[in-house]
């Protein structure tokens, strides 16, 4: 129940608000009322949100046991690897469909990394947590350093699953 209250509920609220914004403003490039960052960053934020939502839903359906997924906490690595590489259970791991889904996981990982890093810095500016331009720049530096490190960690984990 802890994961529902601390993970799923906040993500569901964030996704719901994001979908409402997306329905209202679409994926158009260059929204004039946006004051924190470039139009490209805002557009990439929306695109990464759509990709990330599909990725998270797919991930939940393939991993979570209570949704029929294959993940087993007692055998975390092998069951996660099996869930990624054997999306279609009766197909071999090297089948093009399974390879495609493994690549989509990598695309989802990139989208999540960008969305979180950009969202943290932009959100802090919008909420007034970075009160000066210097504080905003420092936070951007931290996010720009953390994002590649997180992406590298994710890619290394993905490669570990890929060579299993």
Identify the meaning behind each predicted range.
Residues 1-164:
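Membrane-embedded alpha-helical bundles that constitute the cytochrome b-like, heme-associated redox core
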């Amino acid at each position: 129940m802890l994961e529902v209250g601390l993970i799923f509920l906040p993500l569901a609220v964030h996704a719901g608000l994001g979908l409402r914004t997306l329905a209202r403003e679409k994926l158009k490039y260059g929204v004039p009322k946006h004051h924190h960052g470039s139009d490209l960053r805002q557009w990439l934020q929306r695109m990464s949100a759509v990709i990330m939502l599909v990725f998270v839903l797919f991930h939940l359906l393939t991993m979570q046991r209570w949704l029929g997924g294959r993940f087993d906490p007692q055998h975390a690595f092998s069951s996660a690897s099996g869930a990624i590489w054997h999306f279609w259970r009766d197909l071999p791991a090297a089948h093009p469909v399974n390879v495609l889904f493994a690549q989509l996981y990598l695309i989802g990982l990139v989208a999540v990394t960008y969305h979180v890093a950009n969202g943290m810095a932009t959100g802090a500016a919008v909420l007034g947590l970075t009160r000066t331009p210097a504080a905003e720049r420092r936070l951007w530096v931290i996010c720009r350093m953390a994002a590649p490190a997180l992406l590298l960690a994710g890619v290394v984990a993905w490669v570990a699953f890929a060579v299993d």
